């Protein structure tokens, strides 16, 4: 594991975060990494966050004091978003090293280093059993709500469900389906929005290609800022990647979030569903049927304003994806069951 694994840490912190807190989070993130990775296989990508450069270099120097050498610190002058930072780090490792496996871990310490051996073990087993390297493993959270809050947990569950339905429909047209055999030991849809994933070189290259292609196709959409998990997962599934899942630890409450437009869920989540439906050329009757069925099941519909918000996003989907077609009436909640 130590000789064959590379790791990227995208580094961005809010402008008002004290430098001491940044150093603390980075020190925690890098803690004990030398047990599982060689220093030269660790890349910190400071993503257009000048106030984080000194803390990143300080954490790298602390790491070298105990491990013998520093991880690489790459400073990007402009902010490309988490997707851009991870792509930059993966591209470096793919170009400059011979590591067989790659992962990314958040800079807030949420992705516990001691979960990494479990992800690695499953990935290697899958590679051996399947006889190819088109495999990836995700670290599944036991609860989506406690680390992120109720709203984000509900919308991530929606993303996971509709992603599987849409991708399954698209793949079925060519006689295929998503291969989730290694995910089904855990309950529910796989936690595709989890940022703690492990890739082979082949699937890491596909990850980078998916995000770079999506960004270049629609530069005005800034896919690298919001699509790191969603867009890459869709493209990997479509390409026939075999996913596996293992449970991982997570914070009870995240110390920071870089989630864009978290206070505007129509934009934060609506554009992801729009991208999915456009990418797969989903017809309106199917796309809205999936949406209607999914929102009837989520508990977000029961909070004040939640149902209206879900219908607002439904209208947004219809306008953006099928502007020339009148949408059918939305479902009704007030039925006995």
Give residue ranges: language-model regions.
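Short, well-formed alpha-helical segments that are part of the catalytic scaffolds
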Residues: 13-35
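Short beta-strand-to-loop acidic/aromatic patch adjacent to the donor-nucleotide binding site
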Residues: 98-110
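Terminal low-complexity segments of carbohydrate-biosynthetic enzymes
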Residues: 3, 262-337
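Acceptor/aglycone-binding surface of glycosyltransferases and processive sugar-polymer synthases
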Residues: 84-88, 92, 113-206
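A conserved acidic beta->alpha catalytic loop
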Residues: 45-59, 109
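Active-site donor/metal-binding and catalytic loop motifs
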Residues: 240-264
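Conserved donor nucleotide-binding strand/loop of the catalytic core
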Residues: 61-84, 92
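Short beta-strand/loop segment that forms part of the nucleotide-sugar
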Residues: 38-50, 74-78
């Amino acid at each position: 594991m130590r000789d064959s694994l590379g790791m990227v840490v995208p580094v961005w912190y809010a402008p008002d975060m004290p430098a001491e807190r940044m150093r603390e989070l980075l020190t925690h993130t890098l803690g004990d990494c030398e047990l599982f990775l060689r220093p030269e296989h660790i890349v910190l990508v400071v993503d257009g966050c000048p106030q984080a450069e000194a803390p990143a270099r300080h954490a790298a120097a602390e790491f070298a004091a105990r491990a013998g050498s520093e991880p690489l610190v790459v400073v990007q002058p402009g902010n490309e978003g988490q997707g851009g930072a991870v792509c930059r780090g993966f591209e470096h490792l793919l170009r400059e090293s011979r590591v067989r496996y790659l992962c990314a871990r958040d800079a807030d310490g949420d992705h516990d280093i001691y979960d990494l051996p479990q992800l690695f073990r499953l990935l290697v087993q899958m590679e051996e059993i399947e006889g190819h390297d088109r495999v990836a493993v995700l670290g599944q959270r036991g609860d989506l709500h406690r680390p992120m809050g109720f709203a984000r947990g509900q919308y991530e569950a929606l993303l996971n469900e509709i992603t599987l339905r849409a991708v399954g429909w698209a793949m079925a047209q060519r006689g295929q389906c998503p291969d989730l055999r290694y995910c089904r030991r855990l309950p529910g849809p796989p936690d595709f929005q989890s940022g703690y994933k492990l890739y082979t070189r082949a699937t890491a290259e596909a990850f980078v290609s998916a995000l770079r292609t999506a960004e270049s196709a629609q530069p005005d959409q800034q896919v690298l800022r919001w699509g790191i998990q969603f867009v890459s997962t869709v493209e990997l599934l479509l390409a026939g990647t075999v996913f596996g899942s293992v449970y991982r630890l997570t914070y009870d409450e995240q110390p920071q979030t870089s989630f864009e437009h978290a206070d505007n869920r129509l934009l934060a989540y609506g554009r992801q569903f729009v991208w999915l439906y456009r990418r797969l050329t989903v017809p309106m009757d199917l796309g809205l049927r999936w949406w209607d069925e999914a929102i009837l099941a989520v508990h977000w519909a029961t909070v004040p304003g939640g149902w209206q918000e879900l219908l607002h996003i439904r209208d947004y989907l219809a306008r953006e994806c099928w502007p020339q077609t009148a949408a059918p009436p939305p479902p009704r909640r007030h039925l006995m069951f």
